[in-house]
Amino acid sequence: MRAAVAILGVMAIVLSVWMLEAGRMGLSITPFKVSDGPPATLYLAPGEDPAPVVVVTHGFAGSRQLMEPFSLALARAGYMVVSFDFMGHGRNPRPMTGDVTTIN
């Protein structure tokens, strides 16, 4: 009985990981950084003609990883998607400034 439960547990874990990665299959996902800019990710369906670009951003206390399901869905629909982290959020190493009335 324990062996059957263990096998079912392993199968459930494998299925969960497969389902998490299924959304990325067939897409080109390229992290990049432009000089001193924020870290970003480019999502593109390979073999597609040049497509309209969609910039996916996050709200306060968010990250590009949080917005990844939107980026994946748009890339699957044929758009070229660029997603990035604002200062002080996600993997952007630059801290958020205290003065929110000026832009550096």
What are these regions (language model features)?
Residues 60-73, 86:
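The serine-hydrolase catalytic nucleophile loop
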Residues 1-10:
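N-terminal Sec-pathway targeting helices
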Residues 12-49:
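N-terminal cap/lid segment of alpha/beta-hydrolase-fold proteins
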Residues 66-67, 92-96:
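Conserved catalytic-core motifs of eukaryotic protein kinase domains, centered on the activation segment
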Residues 66, 99-104:
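Alpha/beta-hydrolase active-site loop
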Residues 50-59:
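Short beta-strand element of the alpha/beta-hydrolase
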Residues 75-94:
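Conserved alpha/beta-hydrolase
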